[in-house]
Amino acid sequence: MIRVLLVEDDPVIRDTTCYFLKSQQNFEVVCAETGGDALSHAREKFDVILMDILLPDTNGVDLCQRLRSWHHCPIIFTSCLDDTDTIVHALEMGGDDFLAKPYHNKILLARIMANIRRVQMDGAEPSVNGYHCAAFTLDANSHSVEKDGR
């Protein structure tokens, strides 16, 4: 199951994207309308986060930096602001990809899968508690390694 956190304040885009992703096999989508809503889901495990840059209560780039303390999964920014400076800033501040609005859902799906594939090719799966690979868990925050939960 691919878990997606969708952070989007525009109800039409949020509902359309959510419906499209849920129609795909093995997708579970959690929707958040604001940065505060997204933070309430911060400790849950997600495979990818889709986030608008312009949110009513915060800037998506700032939210990205806060979510990075819990998540190492790919963060894909979406925005109608598609100038070079905005895109570069979003990527430099922790985003993994950027998709300008309006976007085609098939392109969004391809970007999601490409970003997930990139993480899987690293041989480790990101999670809320760190990286898991075989019997090992690496927690970058505490600089510790566990084998079989010990």
Language-model segments: residues:
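Short, Lys/Arg-enriched segments at the junction into DNA-binding effector domains
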Residues: R3, A114-R150
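N-terminal/domain-start alpha-helical segments
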Residues: M1-D122
